[in-house]
Swiss-Prot record:
UniProt-recorded name of the protein: Kelch domain-containing protein 10 homolog
Function, as annotated: Activates the Pk92B/DASK1-MAPK signaling cascade.
Alphabetized UniProt keyword annotations: Kelch repeat, Repeat
GO cellular component labels: Cul2-RING ubiquitin ligase complex
Species name: Drosophila melanogaster
Kelch repeat residue intervals: 214-277, 279-334, 335-381, 389-437, 458-508, 510-554
Assembly and binders: Interacts with Elongin-C; may be the substrate recognition component of an E3 ubiquitin ligase complex.
GO biological process terms on file: positive regulation of stress-activated MAPK cascade
Compositional bias per record (Acidic residues), positions renumbered to this chain: 104-137
One Pfam family here: Kelch_4
Length: 609
């Protein structure tokens, strides 16, 4: 008689449950029990009821509000609790950790079988309009993280994840219960954790890219900041590279003209990608747009990635591409491919590639649409890649756009262009609106690609505009590159039409959208809002980590040994930034913080005096 191994049985059960909504509800209920409040005062109960009455759960755009500190209330030491209560909570935490460990074990087994070929392709955008963006002046918000420097960190799991009854009551009343919701757009709240100048200002024309732990934003443009930079003789574009840590929801200025001598000046409508945890940019334009273009490649090293910060311009030779902006780039094997772009006057769809081993450029295809069936020249298109073809989505010229129904794709093996007819989403068809189930032709939109659990490559596009600058989009669509089928995401939509923004995705299947120009009531304003959307149901351990960081955005205050002893797997603790030291004087900002050259100096001084 064959007896089922208990360990194998556990793996089978978890594998069957991880993709079910029942188990997701179990996780949410379990987390709620962990953070339950045993004693709530009358004032706290009234505050909780008031907050719950004002909570709107029907919006597609949900804001994860962070708990606010009560003004004027001094920090209190953790009160003594009954041993029974402490033991119960400790057991609850240990159970959650064991669940996360089991999920991590399952994930590691799956990772050995998976051979993901995710390639995130990002490139720049540009615009020549002169709208002005309001400068944010959020005050620095002190939190309970700011304790005396001499206070020793507790290594107990209870002190890492559990707080006093008062703090738990505030958490229960001010933070909605965590709920994992795929294909829902969520606004990331980060401003209350920074002083003015401690996060990127509103911008367009920037590019973002993501690793497992950080989001990176390079360059961009804002006319208001450009005027200030002009008066001081600085670059009129944002000559800076920012990083955003997903776990702590904090921004950090990694590089700028002050600490990186080789920082490029063509930082609008460039292309940005990540390869072996190194950022690579190509092309771009300075300001005024089209007057100064680039065909250089730059490599960026950041402290967030554990490297010595710096920027290097690659030394290349061979048949270099034309200096232009608005191309799309893909890394295939050891080659960097670039397709399309514009000098400001001429538009191309030529294909070049750079051998990253030798630094030699090679022209592999010159498009001649007037002579053969080649795609017409364009910029502000997006490119996605399935290992055999590079698909070119949309894009256009200064007055035209290209459709998303018949898609040109460069064949990497045959060195030619193929065309693929796509299939519509019949649910999204609207005869009155002229929509036949396809996304409308557009440019200046964003696109990321992700490999689903079935192995299919899926491309997600958001926002954009048409060539006449009169129609703007806030919709989100998905294209399956295997079936060539379009699907409109019905559960998520941008809060307002958005263009000249940028998007990126992390390997766990989460998409991020940052910045851009917002169109509302015939007014256009640049933004620095950050949104996230899970494109798929990730691994169970990823959901557990997302829930932990939702309730605890200060894990970087604890040393890694404490977190490992609490049961958090090493691959998650490695996503945290370097451990912060608790500062003695909470009225002064961190001296190691780099302040953006484009911040408002008067507002920055007033908030730190």
């Amino acid at each position: 008689m064959n007896i089922l191994n208990p360990g194998k049985f556990k793996c089978i059960v978890f594998d069957q449950l991880r993709h079910t909504w029942t188990f997701l509800l179990f996780i949410c209920d379990f987390l709620a029990k962990i953070y339950r409040t045993p004693r709530i005062t009358a004032h706290q109960e009234q505050l909780a009821n008031h907050n719950n009455n004002n909570n709107n759960n029907n919006d597609l755009i949900m804001e994860q509000d962070m708990p606010e500190e009560e003004v004027g209330q001094p920090e209190e030491a953790l009160p003594q609790q009954d041993n029974g209560e402490v033991v119960d909570r400790f057991n609850a935490i240990q159970a959650a950790v064991e669940l996360m460990d089991a999920a991590s074990d399952l994930d590691e087994e799956e990772e050995e079988e998976d051979d993901d070929v995710d390639v995130d392709v990002d490139y720049g955008d540009t615009d020549s309009e002169s709208e002005f963006e309001e400068m944010y002046s959020d005050e620095w918000t002190s939190s309970s993280d700011e304790l005396d420097e001499g206070t020793e960190l507790s290594k107990s799991v209870l002190n890492v994840f559990l707080s006093s009854d008062k703090q738990q009551s505030q958490m229960a009343g001010q933070i909605p219960m965590y709920a994992f919701q795929p294909l829902r757009l969520v606004k990331c709240q980060y401003r209350d954790k920074h002083i003015p100048g401690g996060f990127p200002l509103a911008r367009s024309g920037h590019r973002i890219i993501a690793s497992n732990s950080h989001l990176y934003s390079l360059g961009g443009y804002n006319p208001r900041s450009a005027m200030s930079a002009s008066r001081h003789g600085r670059c009129l574009l944002f000559q800076e590279l920012w990083s955003y840590n997903f776990a702590t929801r904090t921004w950090r200025l990694e590089l700028n003209a002050g600490n990186a001598a080789n920082m490029p000046v063509e930082l609008a409508s460039n292309a940005l990608t990540i390869h072996n945890n190194v950022l690579i940019s190509h092309g771009g334009t300075g300001y005024p747009f089209g007057v100064s273009c680039s065909n250089d490649c730059y490599v960026y090293r950041t402290a967030s990635a554990g490297a010595t910060p710096g920027v290097d311009r690659l030394q290349v030779k061979g048949d270099l591409p034309t200096a232009q902006y608005g191309p799309g780039i893909v890394i295939h094997k050891h080659f960097l491919y670039t397709i399309g772009g514009t000098t400001g006057f001429d538009y191309t769809c030529d294909v070049y590639r750079l051998d990253l081993r030798t630094g030699i450029w090679e022209n592999v295809y010159i498009s001649r649409p007037e002579m053969r069936d080649d795609p017409e020249g364009r910029y502000r298109h997006e490119v996605v890649y399935d290992g055999k073809h590079i698909f070119v989505l949309g894009g256009g010229t200064s007055h035209s756009v290209y459709d998303l129904q018949r898609i040109p794709a460069y064949n990497l093996e045959a060195n030619c262009w193929d065309y693929f007819e796509t299939y519509p989403d019949q649910r999204a068809a609207d005869a009155d609106d002229g929509n036949r189930g396809y996304p409308k032709p557009r440019k200046c939109f964003s696109c990321v690609q992700h490999q689903s659990s079935t192995g299919d490559i899926e491309a997600f596009i958001t926002g954009g505009l048409q060539g006449d600058f009169s129609t703007y989009f806030s919709d989100i669509w998905k294209l399956n590159l295997r079936t060539k089928h379009w699907y409109r995401i019905e559960t998520a939509i941008l809060p307002r039409p958005l263009y000249f923004h940028s998007a990126a995705h992390s390997d766990n299947g989460c998409m991020y959208v940052f910045g851009g120009i917002e169109y509302i009531d015939k007014e256009m304003r640049r933004r620095n809002d950050l949104y996230k959307m899970w494109m798929t149901v990730p691994k169970l351990s990823e959901m557990c980590w997302d829930a932990i960081t939702y309730y605890n955005d200060n894990l970087d205050l604890y040393d890694r040994k404490t977190l490992l002893e609490a049961g958090i797997p090493k691959r998650f603790t490695e996503r945290l930034p370097p451990q912060r030291r608790r500062r003695l004087d909470t009225s002064q900002p961190d001296p190691s913080m780099l302040i953006s050259l484009y911040s408002n100096p008067k507002r920055a001084r007033s908030s730190t005096q």
